[in-house]
Amino acid sequence: MKKILMITQNFYPEIGSAANRMKNIYLELKKKGYEVTVLTSDPSYPNRNLYKDESYWCDETIEQDTVRIHPRTRKYTRNLFRRLMLYIEVVLRFILAIGKDKAKYDYVFVSTPSIFVAAAGMFAKKKMKAKLILDVRDLWPESLIGVGFFNKRWILKIAYKFEYKMYHTADQILINSRGFFSYITSKGIDPKRISFMPNSLTEEELSVIPAENTGDKLTVIYTGNIGLAQDITKLISVAEYLQDYKNITFKIIGYGYKKNIAYDMMKMKKLANIQFLKPKNREDTLAEVASADIAYVSLVEEDVFKKVLPGKVIDYMSVKKPIVADVDGYAKEVIGEAKCGFVAENRTVSELGDYIIKLASDKQLRKQLGENGYQYAFQTLRWKTNIETLVQILEEKDVTEESLHVCMESFHK
């Protein structure tokens, strides 16, 4: 069976969509009989101390195939220089580890962002004379510009040149969002080299039974990153808008650069209807979502975020929760296709709040939208079936017709 070297900065037991995607790709390939070695970093996202809790380390067998580097830079930060130092250190340590690896591989599978990690994949391709599969989970440097992370022209010039090189060096490109297709082809990439494999759900996750609320109090939940791309301060304003509705409370479970800003905003407004919880492992987070009544998702109003689908949308679908969304573009399109919630057209606080009121007052509507989302996920977002896109690439079968049909279908509706 073919041997694969997977290179990823984010991996088990880290929380977040990136690590979850890589873990499941690894597990599915192992089930198919492939020999997979994972080159990754010590878990550090969003912070290293989180993983001192043994509840995050729930599968010891994964570590048997995992080679970890140990960066000295230990903290994610908004500081541009320190963030760049972390990325550069990680890729240099990856390259050193690859240089010492005497094994033979048929494929190198590298996941971005950050695009720096792709440099390790490109090095591995050349050293090992293997084919390179590039997994694109986000568009860098576009997304960094979208959140205002940096705008230094000389850095952007280098980043765009490297991005171009990265796409053109890859033998095959996987995307987890249909919204990435036109952007990548605009860089001169043959559409036949691009395949669509969305973030998906395991059979166990699709078997979680959501709690049924028999009372009159309802919880609106948000989970995941509270960073520059999510605009969670608007959710605080929505909670303020609904503070007279004593039966509606908000629960925020997450981490990120803007968590303290959102928390301080809640305190300043003296809102008693919001509960902030520390990050939890994936299983416990899904259990929290399953026990809630309405799920919330948001992205800042920048063009680059019209191309992405937050992983939490898929998680919300898996436990049959109706969604209220402050999004546009691809995420809006998926929620519309699934008929699993409401997307605010004008993206105002009052519109979002009114959708929550509408759902809170109609139990049958909540149930129907939740069921719609679950059926959409069950039919289209299962790792068990979606991994076949990657398997066909590894077996060098023609995936173009099927994968690109899925990728492009919504653009022609």
Residue ranges: model-predicted function:
Residues 337-338, 342-349, 358-364:
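Conserved acidic donor-binding segment of nucleotide-sugar-dependent glycosyltransferases
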Residues 92-95, 99, 116-119, 123-127, ...:
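Membrane-proximal helix-turn-helix segments that form the acceptor-binding/catalytic region
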Residues 253-254, 259-287:
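Nucleotide-activated donor-binding/catalytic signature segment of Leloir-type glycosyltransferases, i.e.
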Residues 294-297, 315-326:
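Short hydrophobic beta-strand element within catalytic cores of glycosyltransferases
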Residues 351, 358, 365-379:
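A short, well-ordered alpha-helix in the C-terminal region of glycosyltransferases
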Residues 1-61, 172, 242-244, 406-413:
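N-terminal subdomain of nucleotide-sugar transferases
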Residues 5, 213-230, 235-240, 251:
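Conserved donor-binding/catalytic core segment of Leloir-type glycosyltransferases
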Residues 179, 200:
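Carbohydrate-associated surface elements
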